[in-house]
């Protein structure tokens, strides 16, 4: 019996000036992938654009929250700043991952919608491979991890209500 094909994902892609070349390379690499239905580029588009990473990360994460895209790929120098920023949007789970196992578990264990790379940390060929693998994973709402992800969401709601 053949496996059910995975539905294609709507992606956002974002970077600061430290991630422009990887963003462009990854966007080109993913644009022909059948698991991608669309890519929304929220910038930046040039190394001369000094828009700080929090702005583009929040913009891309908000697209997920608003249901306009399914996931986002973000690149900065380390991948850490964009992840921290994206995680400020309620309901968003962003991770920085530079290896196969972490990319897999980001989806299967944590239902992370955002994958972040550091252009100064990871080679472009590995980034392309990991981004391609990332597209093949889907979170199982019936998995043992679902309760843990729900606990994260519950805590988030609790703290949002308090503040």
From Swiss-Prot:
GO biological process: carbohydrate metabolic process
Active site: 76 (proton acceptor)
Enzyme Commission number(s) from the entry: 5.3.1.-
Top-rank lineage group of the source organism: Eukaryota
Name assigned to this protein: Putative ribose 5-phosphate isomerase
Family: Belongs to the LacAB/RpiB family.
Residues that hold D-ribulose 5-phosphate according to the record: 16-17, 77-81, 110, 120, 148
GO MF, one annotated term: isomerase activity
Pfam families: LacAB_rpiB
Organism: Coccidioides immitis (strain RS) (Valley fever fungus)
UniProt entry keywords in alphabetical sequence: Isomerase
Quaternary structure note: Homodimer or homotetramer.
Keyword hit for Isomerase: yes
SUPFAM superfamilies noted in UniProt: Ribose/Galactose isomerase RpiB/AlsB
